[in-house]
Design a protein with these regions (language model features):
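Bacterial N-terminal signal peptides
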Residues: 15-22
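Substrate/cofactor-recognition hotspot
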Residues: 138
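Walker B catalytic acidic pair
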Residues: 141
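Bacterial N-terminal signal peptides that target proteins for export
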Residues: 2-14
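Predominantly extracellular/secreted Zn2+-dependent metalloproteases
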Residues: 2, 25-135, 145-167
Length: 167
């Protein structure tokens, strides 16, 4: 092969690698929130942070445990110094691809132990009509990201506990 052919071949490989990396990178990137969904999450997150300034509200982190029996406060301490710092690290992303978001009236979805919350299309309406509930749901999902499973406790029980502690 000539030098010119080798250079062209090298450029083609490099171009293909760049395109593949860009495609893979975009496919793996979480869907960012836009418009009202983003504003609804920002507003509810700010409200949740204000509620968590209360010592009584922060007790929700010791009210629940993960599957290994550790309190969520212990899991929080492993990750960061405060609930406010941790909530700032948790991405809230578009949940339109999630079955629970498509098939139910669920507002937010999180997997126990995974630091990510999916935002369903109903969340913005909840935040608009019942801002206190939206703030409680943010805290509820943060508990899941720290390892809290469900059933038991039920989703309703978790939200009720958050509402009782975080008035």
């Amino acid at each position: 092969m000539s030098k010119k052919g080798s250079r062209s071949s090298g450029r083609a490989v490099l171009t293909s690698a760049i395109l593949l990396a860009a495609t893979v990178g975009n496919a793996a990137a979480p869907l960012t929130l836009t418009g009202w969904d983003r504003r609804a999450v920002e507003t509810a997150r700010r409200g949740a942070l204000k509620r968590l300034e209360s010592e009584e509200c922060r007790k929700v982190f010791i009210d629940f445990t993960d599957a290994q029996g550790r309190t969520l406060q212990q899991n929080l301490e492993k990750r960061t110094a405060s609930p406010a710092e941790y909530i700032g690290l948790v991405p809230f992303v578009d949940g339109s691809s999630q079955a629970l978001c498509r098939e139910t009236k669920t507002a937010l979805v999180a997997t126990p132990g995974v630091r990510r919350v999916f935002v369903c299309r109903t969340f913005a309406e909840v935040q608009l009509r019942q801002p206190g509930l939206a703030e409680s749901l943010v805290i509820h999902e943060i508990l899941h990201t720290l390892g809290l499973g469900e059933n038991p406790p039920t989703s309703i029980e978790i939200t009720q506990r958050v509402q009782a502690r975080c008035r």
